[in-house]
Amino acid sequence: MILESAAVIYRGFPKRLHHAVPHWVETRALFHIRMTLDCEKKQRALTQPNLAQALLDSAKFFENKQRWHITLFLLMPDHLHALLSFARDQSMSGIIGDWKRFHARKNRVVWQEGYFDHRLRADERGEQLSAKLNYIRHNPVAAGLCDKPEDWTWIIDPFG
């Protein structure tokens, strides 16, 4: 094992990534976030209607409380995609941890540890943002869950 500043490396792969946003990242930077269910546990699908509505309602609640800003938030049966931005004085990992813990307690959702995040750089936002939006919106179609992106129910898409 080799210790590096951003991750512990095991067999060439990060064992754990740290999600601290560097101080030089612009305010309201946009992040592609992916959270996944723990597949080893028996799970209710995130798209089960009561759970899906609770997840979407709490995502909107977090936005109303200015914990994050939603550009896109889409539920799949075993994971979710979100394009979110956070105020500079907010901890991205803290906010996501709070949201996941809330659903772990209230709805017995068992999440995989951590989450994936990728910052969309300001100079790439136009093309890269369009590609990310398209990819996420078409995820249910690619999985055979609906015929067209606009048929998918479990989404918050303020710009779509």
Regions found by a protein language model. Give the residues of each.
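Short catalytic/metal-binding and nucleic-acid-binding patches
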Residues: M1-G160
